[in-house]
A protein has these predicted regions:
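Bacterial N-terminal signal peptides that target proteins for export
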Residues: 1-6
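Cys-dependent protein tyrosine phosphatase-like superfamily
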Residues: 18-178, 192-292
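Ser/Thr-glycine-rich phosphate-binding loops at phosphate-binding pockets of nucleotides
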Residues: 184, 188-189
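Catalytic nucleophile loop of clan PA
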Residues: 181
Length: 292
């Protein structure tokens, strides 16, 4: 029973509804139309993805702003519609970076629109997640599900600095818009967005606020997944205990920040020393992605 429920959970996490419901002509192009350069339009209207959003508009500590239409974070793109594909092309996206593991990509291969380059940077922090969740559902462990994601955020700093260095170097070298994603668009992609914004000079609090927007943008989907898990288990499983896995908590990203700060003294030093991104590199990044 619990293996079945665990399977249902991962199926639901991977599931997206793909029906062309959003008129392509009415989708916002932030870069060329300042009417869309606001919080109301930060989440992109996608038929086959739930957490695709803009990183433009965030203010930096020196009074500049992140350019609209240059940086996008997302969940997986394996179920996007033809209209979604055209939309990504209309946004001018040059490159898609995928943080998913080999197994995740085999289960749900990305749909890459024509003319957009695709780069794989696998981060496999979820390899043992299924068995851990099954143990929680069975009551065999008192360890909270949220502790799994706390540990994962520590690993982003301790075990995957090389991947995140490669990610930032791709942004530095890329001249056009980039979209980066994982499966749910919240943990691996969330940390990538966080270090990018920190490197650009956005305050830690504003970075955390962007991280937390996942809960706002995916709330309806989270409720659907919880209802589905309870239904498939004939209400024998308490799906509520899995809620921390489906969204984000401030503690997750703060754990990553604390891990970096304890080892390197500050997030800025983590980027310089832990990710080997020099001050010259940071200036190049800012020249590309910031405006006055």
């Amino acid at each position: 029973m619990f293996k079945k429920v665990t399977g249902v959970l991962f199926f639901c996490l991977a599931l997206t509804q793909c029906s062309e419901t959003t008129d392509l002509m009415n989708r916002p192009i932030h870069k060329t139309d300042n009417a869309f350069q606001n919080e109301e339009h930060r989440l992109l209207p996608m038929d086959g993805a739930h957490n695709t959003r803009e990183l433009g508009g965030y203010k930096t500590n020196d009074g500049k702003s992140v350019k609209w239409g240059m940086l996008f974070r997302s969940d997986k793109l394996s179920d996007i519609s033809k209209a979604d594909q055209q939309y990504l092309q209309n946004l001018g996206i040059n490159k898609i970076i995928d943080f998913r593991s080999k197994e995740e990509k085999a289960e749900d291969p990305n749909i890459i629109p024509k003319g957009i380059s695709y780069v794989e940077m696998p981060i496999s922090v979820d390899g043992a997640m299924r068995s851990k969740i099954e143990a929680v559902l069975k009551g065999e462990t008192n360890k909270e599900v949220k502790s799994f994601l706390i540990d994962a955020n520590k690993e982003f700093v301790s075990d995957y600095s090389g991947v995140y260095e490669e990610f930032l170097r791709n942004l530095i070298d890329e001249d056009g818009p980039t979209l980066f994603h994982c499966t749910a668009g919240k943990d691996r992609a969330g940390f990538a967005a966080a270090i990018t914004l920190i490197a650009l000079g956005v305050s830690k609090e504003n970075v955390i606020q962007d991280y937390m927007k996942t809960n706002q943008f995916t709330q309806e989907r989270i409720e659907e997944i919880i209802d589905q898990i309870e239904l498939m288990s004939l209400y024998q499983a308490d799906a509520e205990i899995l809620r921390p896995l489906l969204g984000v908590e401030r503690e997750y990203i703060e754990t990553a920040f604390k891990t970096a700060e304890e080892k390197f003294g500050s997030l800025e030093n983590f980027i310089r020393e832990g990710l080997n991104i020099s001050d010259k590199d940071i200036q190049k990044l800012r020249n590309k992605y910031l405006e006055s």
